Amino acid sequence: MTVTFRKALHKSNLGCLIYITNPNKTDGGLLVSGINCSPDANLAHNEMLMMNRLYNNKGRRTGYHIYQSFNYTDKLSYEEAHEIGIETVKRLYPNFQAVVATHIDKAHIHNHIVLNSVNIKTGKKLTDSLWHEEGISNLRKVSDEISKEYGLTVLNDAPPINKYSN
């Protein structure tokens, strides 16, 4: 059962990038990849900052922290989990900078993804809404599609959790 979560980052992505790329959690850094940026935390941070400055984006949201967790009963190698994280970013956020890191230090394998908030082609910020094509509901849909391709279990009919209520 693949579970996804996404939250906005404010001020700086660096702290999150340093955490997710920790060599003690990522098989010595072998399970860290950069998409449209360096896999190195400091370099990726600088590249993301440069992209924000290029498009003069000064908003509060600097990026997003995406968490993708897999059921410990699923037969999944570290490399396959990492491939799923990379493929999720490539399908859903192809024009964004991201660092994908697979953590293997716990009983359950999980991915952390730091995604820059700025589209490298348009300069527009990611649309942070539940139902938009870049939104959390589509994150789950794409993650579930890829998980099924790898023969993993997915949650059935679980609505997205929205902390805001009417």
Stretches found by the model and what they are:
Residues 1-166:
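N-terminal nicking endonuclease/strand-transfer module with a His-rich metal-binding environment
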